[in-house]
Regions:
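Residue-level "micro-hotspots" composed of small/polar
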Residues: 19-25, 54, 58-71, 101-118, ...
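Residue-level detector of Asp-centered blade-edge/turn motifs that repeat once per structural unit
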Residues: 29-32, 76-79, 122-125, 170-173, ...
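Conserved beta-propeller blade signature
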Residues: 35-36, 81-83, 127-130, 175-177, ...
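Cytoplasmic juxtamembrane amphipathic helix immediately C-terminal to a transmembrane segment
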Residues: 230, 622-638
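Loop/turn residues immediately N-terminal
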Residues: 3-6, 41-44, 88-91, 133-137, ...
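Primarily the dimerization/phosphotransfer
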Residues: 634-672
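Short loop/turn segments that connect beta-strands within beta-propeller blades
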Residues: 10-13, 48-51, 94-98, 141-145, ...
Length: 672
């Protein structure tokens, strides 16, 4: 009721009054048949399966209570959580722990546009649609909220000290140590969900520089080692919480060769340190440094080190920017350089003796002993030790999103799978099938830019990725979801630059384009665009869209990123079928038959006129021809007749001449 709470009328028509006060705004029954009742001013009522009524009110001292006593709507998601729209925020109630998680409007693009929620509706895909008081409509799907975000904060306990994240490592207690650019080192206490910052403080025992590029955890010695940019090497004694700094000294050959440290990796009881000026072997006990390879021609080319790795055979691999990869054996003092050589062809197995690019970002050895190299511009290389050859995987051959790979790790969840970060996001590589699956902002990946080396997998399988907008984490298992079904719709038709609407002056559409199976266009309407859309609003559920115009071309074309208009121009008259589909067989393709009429001079009645006119002309010409033939024959006959008469006259004349001659001769004789 509006002011008297809730009344209950049972099967026996007995009326009771279980909730006696409150302006009731909403009654919702969840999948467990439990009731959730929203009220204005008296919070949320929950009637459980036993019929017990629980009144949940806002408690300013409890951050896990409902955010407001003014509740407008309730809805259950597909995970069994109850979402409550209130005057001051959206609340998620988890039955398992009885706590409320509150979401309010913020400056971030992924936050609510307004905190006052009026209504909540769940669609067939499980997406929740929120009507706000002054922020329009918001939507999201809780099933696909698999990423946890960590952002820079002004408060140490609540977030990162810097939004630019680098290398990470886990300690024995499961805490994550994070290198940042400009914010020192952050420690994330995963169990508590809190942070601690280790930043440079002038005049105090602290890290020497806030731009930290390398990290190594010595569990046995209970020490953390940090490599900084311009601050040299730092040791943190975890027992005393004190820092020791190691810097380059011009007059000391046993000091660091540079204060710019790029990577640190252990070797027996020593540390191999990669710097901006080569590689050195650092002894933590004597605190002295021995620079490697400085006396060899090959070694002098090693300057800017991108990554270091010691494989299971104790071979040191060095990624040197612009110089390819080096392998070094300490026992034999043998240094080998692997460089790119474009003149060396690939064999039948796509193997070559040349690495694909001289700029290698990271090196990794998987559980099978395979060595992998990520490059800046040529994708991923696999080193085959038995043949001393490389196999390359890239965008063109294998579907990688970008050929610039920053870091590689082996999956802890899926066998024979690699995880990679690129300058386009995050990718999984199925090694047996030689195929990549890519994640980017288009399919729900939350980071627009991933940083170098900022990929780490914890012992319990949680994946952490860092970028220039903070850090995210997720579990690989969450990436393998059952795709949701949806529909493809044709939404708009534009002909010769003008949008066509039902029953307009063109007469092309009588109904909405989505409900129109075929259209007819005039001859001068052969330039048109068709807009498509889908009922899918889940980024992670997006599929590749393909289209084809049968009658024009049977080739399937893929839709480019951000494109939802498909245009055709100067089509010949005829009948075509426009088809839009996805690569998934369970999504029904949409079809539109298009008839383009010919111009009037190509219509059937025009051709009939042409035939009649041509036939009549032919008949006329035939008649004229026949008349001329008859006239010619008549003239010939007359001519022949005249000639015959002339011949007859001549014959008569000759006859009479001869007769007269015959008669005249005797008479002449008689007269004579």
């Amino acid at each position: 009721t509006e002011n008297s709470g809730v009344y209950k009328l049972d099967k026996n028509k007995t009326l009771t009054h279980p909730i006696e006060k409150g302006n009731i705004t909403n009654i919702y029954q969840d999948s467990s048949k439990e009731l959730w009742i929203g009220s204005w001013e008296y919070g949320l009522y929950h009637i459980d399966s036993e019929g017990i009524i629980h009144n949940m009110r806002h408690d300013p001292s409890n951050p896990n209570s409902v955010s407001s006593d003014f509740v407008r709507d309730c809805c259950e998601d597909n995970n069994g959580n109850i979402w409550i729209g209130t005057f001051n925020g959206l609340n998620r109630y988890q039955k398992s722990n009885g706590r409320f998680d509150v979401y309010t409007a913020g400056h971030e693009t992924e936050s609510l546009t307004h905190s006052s929620i009026w209504c909540i509706v769940k669609d067939a895909q499980g997406t929740l649609w929120l009507g706000t008081y002054f922020g329009g409509v918001n939507y999201f799907n809780p099933e696909y909220e698999i990423y946890t975000r960590y952002k820079a904060s002004d408060t140490e306990r609540d977030g990162l000290s810097s939004s630019i994240i680098g290398r990470m490592i886990e300690d024995k207690d499961g805490n994550l140590w994070i290198c940042t650019e400009g914010g020192g080192v952050n420690v994330y206490y995963r169990k508590e969900g809190t942070f601690r910052w280790l930043r440079h403080e002038e005049g105090r025992n602290s890290i020497s520089h806030n731009n930290v590029k390398a990290i190594y955890y010595d569990e046995k010695g209970e020490r953390m080692w940090f490599g900084t940019h311009l601050g040299g090497l730092n040791k943190l004694d975890l027992r005393t919480n004190r820092f020791t700094h190691y810097r380059m000294k011009e007059d000391d050959p046993h000091s660091l060769p540079s204060d710019i440290i790029r990577d640190i990796t252990p070797f027996h009881d020593q540390l191999i340190v990669g710097t901006q000026n080569g590689v050195c072997l650092f002894d933590p006990e004597t605190e002295t440094c021995q620079q490697l390879f400085k006396d060899t021609r090959e070694g002098q080319a090693i300057k800017m080190v991108a990554d270091l790795f010691v494989d299971r055979d104790s071979t040191l691999w060095i990624a040197a920017t612009g110089e390819g990869v080096y392998s070094y054996r300490f026992d034999t003092d043998k240094l080998i350089n692997y460089r790119h050589d474009s003149t060396i062809p690939n064999d039948v197995d796509n193997h070559t003796n040349s690495i694909s690019n001289n700029n290698v970002n990271s090196i990794m050895q998987d559980s099978q002993g395979n060595l992998w190299f990520s490059t800046s511009g040529s994708g991923l290389d696999l080193y085959h030790k038995e043949t001393d050859s490389f196999e390359n995987f890239d965008m063109q051959k294998n579907g990688l999103s970008s050929d610039c790979i920053y870091e590689i790790h082996e999956s802890s969840f899926k066998k024979s799978c690699l995880l990679l970060i690129t300058n386009q996001g995050f990718s999984q590589f199925d090694v047996p099938n030689r195929k990549f699956h890519n994640y980017s902002i288009e399919n729900g990946f939350p980071l627009t830019a991933v940083n170098e080396n900022a990929l780490y997998i914890t012992r319990d399988g949680e994946v952490f990725l860092g970028g220039v907008q903070g850090m995210i984490s997720f579990h690989e298992k969450a990436l393998f979801f059952t795709p949701k079904s949806y529909n493809i719709l044709l939404s708009r038709l534009i002909v010769n630059g003008k949008e066509i609407t039902p029953d307009d002056e063109t007469g092309i559409l009588q109904y909405s384009l989505s409900y129109t199976p075929e259209i007819t266009l005039q001859a001068n309407q052969n330039m048109f665009s068709i807009e498509y859309t889908t009922s899918n609003y889940i980024p992670a559920n997006r599929d590749k869209i393909l289209y084809c115009l049968e009658g024009f071309s049977n080739e399937w074309n893929s839709v480019q990123r951000g494109q939802n208009f498909i245009t055709y121009t100067n089509l010949n008259p005829g009948t075509y079928t426009f088809i839009v589909k996805t690569q998934r067989e369970d999504i029904k393709a949409v079809r539109l038959k298009i008839h383009i009429l010919p111009p009037w001079y190509e219509t059937w009645w025009a051709y009939l006129i042409y035939v009649v006119f041509t036939g009549s002309l032919l008949l006329y010409l035939i008649q004229v021809y026949k008349s001329r033939i008859r006239l010619r024959e008549s003239l010939k006959y007359e001519q022949k007749h005249i000639e015959d008469l002339e011949s007859l006259n001549q014959s008569k004349l000759r006859f009479f001449t001869n007769i007269s001659h015959e008669f005249r001769t005797p008479l002449t004789l008689i007269v004579g």
